[in-house]
Structure formats: C-alpha cells, structure tokens
C-alpha cells in the first residue's frame, strides 16, 4: 500500500509512536547486534539500527524497529501486526519526524508475514512533532545526537 493513497493509515501508524516513554539506558551497539533499544512504553519498545544513520540533505535518516506487546490492527480487515520496520527522517532543529517507509509484520521482531506496507516520496512527507519523552522524541534524540 502506498501511503499517499491513504494518509489516514500512515497518520494512525505514526500516532502509535507518540506515546510517553520510559527512557531505556543506552548501551553501545555491537557489530552483531543490529538493533539498539532506545524507548519503551507499556505497549511497545522501539529500537534503532545505528549503522543506518545517514544525512539526507538537511535531515537525518534512520531505520527503526518497533515491537508491540499486543497485536495492532492493520489496514486490511482481519489482519494484525506485532512489529514494524520503518525508515524515518528527522528534522533535528524543528524536532519533527516523518516516515519514509513502513512494513508491518504479523509477529514480533519482524517475523511472520508482511501484513501492511507504506512508502512516501520526499515531496509528500508528513512531518509530525517529536515531543520529548515520547517514542518519536527518543528516536529523534538518538538520531540527532552529536557523533
């Protein structure tokens, strides 16, 4: 599914990451550990792939994985997902985040069938606030920290 065709689905998926979080103590990721936990709530945990950090113009781009405690409803009726892999763009100066790509998987840790896909072109990115102490905020803080 292309997000431009159904922006409501994209916004609802993004809303799942705007929940308050308890900050996870950051530990350095090793070469064998692709995903590094950065945020955890009662219903989800967010991970980043440090090797995916890249500058795209004035923005930082990074891959993230989210595991949900309970299955989340997918756009397709009767389908649910328990994990997502996304490519986010971050505007560090404005504390904004936009989702470039998203794949939702039936099981945790990106396992099982892909039940939903979304992709947005650079000109159609929907920028959302990334307040501190939310999943988006923690993802942005990780992406934007000086290296």
Descriptions of predicted regions:
Residues 11-20:
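Bacterial N-terminal signal peptides
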Residues 21-85, 89-147:
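N-terminal secretory-pathway/extracellular module detecting exported/lumenal segments
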Residues 1-11:
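Bacterial N-terminal signal peptides that target proteins for export
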């Amino acid at each position: 599914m292309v997000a431009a065709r159904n922006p409501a689905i994209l916004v609802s998926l993004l809303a799942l990451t705007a929940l308050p979080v308890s900050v996870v103590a950051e530990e350095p990721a090793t070469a064998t550990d692709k995903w590094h936990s950065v945020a955890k709530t009662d219903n989800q945990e967010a991970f980043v792939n440090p090797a995916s950090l890249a500058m795209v113009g004035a923005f930082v781009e990074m891959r993230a994985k989210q595991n949900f405690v309970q299955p989340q409803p997918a756009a397709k009726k009767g389908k649910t997902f328990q994990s997502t892999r996304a490519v986010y763009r971050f505007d560090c100066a404005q504390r904004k985040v936009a989702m470039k790509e998203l794949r939702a998987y039936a099981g945790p840790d990106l396992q099982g069938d892909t039940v939903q896909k979304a992709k947005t072109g650079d000109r159609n990115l929907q920028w959302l606030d990334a307040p501190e102490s939310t999943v988006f905020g923690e993802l942005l803080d990780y992406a934007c920290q000086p290296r």
